[in-house]
C-alpha cells in the first residue's frame, strides 16, 4: 500500500497523475485529502487516517508519499506511524512561506518543534527525498542541507515544484518500499 498526500494545491490534476504513476509499483494507492489550512487539525486527521489504513492493510511494507506540503506531513506522520516515507520537494518551512495562504502558519513551527526530539536521527534512512533542481517555489539546496545528513537525496534535473512526472524514479521508489 502507498498512501499519497497532496501538496497545498489539493485540486491539482497532477495529484491524480502521480497516483496513477505510483500504481505501476503498487496497485493499492490511497490518497488522503486534508484541509491544508488548519495545521493542528490536519495533523490529527492525517495520523488517524494513516493509522486506520495501516491497521486495515495486509501490506507490512506500506509507504507514505507526499509532495510539497504533503512532504512535510509524510515525513512526520510516516515516522509516527512507523512506515517508510518518500517526500518530493517537501515544504520543510511552511511557517515561513505559507503566510497569507493559511490561517495559522505559526502552527507548523509548533508542530515541527513538538514532534519527537531528534526525530530525523531516529528516522535515519527510512525516508527518501526527491528534489528538483528546477523547483521554482522552494530552495532545494536548503532542503538538501537540512535532510541530507539523515536521508538519501535523489536529484531530478527536469521537474518543477509540482514534480508532474515521477515515472523515471518509480523503480527506485519500489526498491525503497521493499526494504520495509
Curated annotation (Swiss-Prot):
InterPro entries reported for this sequence? AB_hydrolase_fold, UPF0227, UPF0227/Esterase_YqiA
Gene3D superfamilies in the record: alpha/beta hydrolase
Q: Which Pfam families match?
A: UPF0227 (PF05728)
Tell me which family the UniProt entry assigns to this protein.
Belongs to the UPF0227 family.
Q: What is this protein called?
A: UPF0227 protein ECA1814
Amino acid at each position: 500500500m502507498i498512501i499519497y498526500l497532496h501538496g497545498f494545491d489539493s485540486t491539482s490534476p497532477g495529484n491524480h497523475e502521480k497516483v496513477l504513476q505510483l500504481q505501476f509499483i503498487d496497485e493499492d494507492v490511497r490518497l488522503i485529502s486534508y484541509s491544508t489550512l488548519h495545521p493542528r487539525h490536519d495533523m490529527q486527521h492525517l495520523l488517524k487516517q494513516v493509522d486506520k489504513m495501516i491497521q486495515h492493510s495486509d501490506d507490512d511494507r506500506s509507504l507514505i508519499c507526499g509532495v510539497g506540503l504533503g512532504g512535510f506531513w509524510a515525513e512526520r506522520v510516516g515516522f509516527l506511524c512507523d512506515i517508510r516515507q518518500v517526500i518530493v520537494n517537501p515544504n520543510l518551512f511552511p511557517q515561513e512561506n505559507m503566510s497569507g495562504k493559511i490561517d495559522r502558519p505559526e502552527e507548523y513551527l509548533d508542530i515541527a518543534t513538538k514532534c519527537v526530539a531528534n526525530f530525523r536521527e531516529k528516522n535515519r534512512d527510512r525516508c527518501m527525498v526527491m528534489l528538483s533542481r528546477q523547483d521554482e517555489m522552494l530552495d532545494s539546496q536548503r532542503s538538501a542541507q537540512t535532510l541530507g545528513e539523515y536521508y538519501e537525496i535523489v536529484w531530478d534535473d527536469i521537474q518543477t515544484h509540482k514534480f508532474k512526472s515521477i515515472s523515471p524514479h518509480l523503480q527506485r521508489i519500489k526498491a525503497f518500499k521493499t526494504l520495509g
